[in-house]
Amino acid sequence: MSEKIKRLNFKHLQQAAWKGTKKSIPATTLCLLLFFMNMALFGYKNAVIAVPLTIIFNRLKDFSPDRWHPYSVMLINLVLATTAHLADMNVWLCVTLDFAATYLMVFLLTDSDTSKAYYSYGFGLVLYQSFSTTVPELRLRLMAIVVSSAIATLGLVVMYFLKRRQTGFKLDPRIFNPFVHLGGKTREFLKGTARAFKNLAAMLRFHLFWDPSEPLESGTFDFRLTRFAIRISLLVTFSFFLEQVFNIPKGYWLPLNVFIMTLNFYEDSMVKIKQRVGGNIAGVFISAILLHYITGFTGHMIILSIGTFLGYAVDNYLFRATYMTCYAIALSTLFMKQSEVFELRLAYVLLAAVIAVIGSRFIFANKKTDFQT
């Protein structure tokens, strides 16, 4: 009986490993292609473009082609790169632009309590700002985004042809015509922006002057969304402010972790914080062991590639955070001392956890228990 159980468990592990491999190969291939291509053609600062575009690709590859919106994806990234360039000029622009960009991004790209369409673009904003650019470098970054977006879209087309019999989706060539979709998207953006700022003003009037506002009736989706968008914008902006004022090494790890840990509901944020902190601690420990035996540029790239593959292969966020920490450390230790990287990684994730806990608990908090009927 025990032998039969062992065979069943081994078969289950094989099936899970094969499922994870099939899931990870497309995203890993695109991520590494964009990473090394941008590093070679556009400089190491633009290698980070691979991260947000791969997350977007990984989300869209299972959607029907009419939901890809390739020009919108490219334009949003171009706007975020330009915003990040301007925000890096001084503290006042940092506070103003980072708050506005994060607020609009979260508000306009969230259509349900569990939606995380904004997630990949938040990565882009943080990474674009952290790897700052001069004006000539900005032009290079915009070119890199255009090229990378085209390659990511090509990847979606390849995935469509590989899976079309299984999904039954139809590919309408008109989705690649910018004049067909951008007009409607522009109108949606303007209406959404007006609604976003109207809700922001109403929420602030209510909390600052106790002026009840009709558009924000308590318990509605708009009410929860506006509170969440304000909260995450305040926390991310505060983190960017600390990074810019103190000019701390690897400072972008702070706003990035705060952004990841802050979710719509307090209960979900607490789960994500525990997983993120646990994954980072495990990732630092594993990286310390690996880097003791694996040295040199090639060795670091091997760890980076394996971390990327495993990160996209698993669904459990604790393991994903572990593997992606190995990815980040393998890259960072090429330019900094290992001990310093380990210390900074742990310090930032713990500080980010404190910020996210306080913010999720006390700043425009949304608790599931408050909205249960």
Question: What are these regions, as identified by a protein language model?
Answer:
Residues M1-Y323, L331-T373:
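Alpha-helical transmembrane segments and their membrane-interface boundaries
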